[in-house]
């Protein structure tokens, strides 16, 4: 199962599969539309080691980084960790570019300068230029990101941990979706900042 879903559901699917003498793997991916087209996805796999080994030739056709994370559900927990990092990172990217614009800096020059330093990230490198062009075409839809953030918050609640950064990111994305931006890419978050003026 290469969708992004609940880690608990992944465990339930594996139990049902094993009753029938089958294996089930949860193998969500990261890398967006570009990673998928170029077979450079990061694939995070949960499930039995033997099943992962059997599926490895298929995974290698789609991805560059294939990581067996442990038992069923661990692929999904890893994907949630990925989404949590992206949520806060995307807020940081948007706030940095918005701050630069409002201060009168040449935002393209700022993007080049900070991409080469400690602030550099895949979000900044891939989505920063799209933000500057006001290109909100989806590599990953806001509506799907909202779903993922809710799954992460549900699992965090089960673990009895608080993720205030993720809660804030979800709030901003939900506000954007309510204004009709749910079918845009996650870089569309910058519009939340534009609308504050």
Question: Model features per residue range: what roles?
Answer:
Residues 4-83, 87:
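Rossmann-fold dinucleotide-binding core
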Residues 74-197:
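Helical "substrate-binding/catalytic lid" subdomain
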């Amino acid at each position: 199962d290469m969708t992004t879903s609940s880690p608990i559901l992944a465990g339930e699917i594996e139990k049902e599969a094993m009753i029938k003498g089958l294996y089930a793997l949860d193998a969500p991916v990261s890398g967006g539309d570009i990673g998928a087209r170029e077979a450079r996805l990061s694939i995070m796999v949960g499930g039995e080691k033997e099943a992962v080994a059997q599926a490895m030739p298929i995974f290698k056709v789609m991805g560059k980084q294939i990581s067996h994370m442990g038992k069923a559900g661990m692929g999904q927990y890893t994907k949630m960790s990925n989404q949590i990092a992206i949520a806060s990172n995307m807020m940081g990217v948007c706030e940095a570019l918005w701050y630069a614009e409002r201060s009168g800096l040449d935002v393209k020059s700022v993007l080049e300068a900070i991409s080469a330093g400690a602030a550099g990230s895949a979000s900044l490198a891939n989505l920063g230029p799209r933000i500057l062009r006001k290109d909100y075409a989806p590599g990953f839809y806001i509506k799907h990101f909202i779903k993922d953030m809710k799954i992460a918050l549900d699992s965090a609640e089960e673990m009895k941990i608080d993720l205030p950064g993720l809660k804030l990111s979800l709030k901003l994305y939900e506000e954007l979706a309510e204004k009709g931006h749910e079918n845009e890419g996650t870089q569309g978050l910058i519009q939340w900042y534009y609308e504050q003026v």
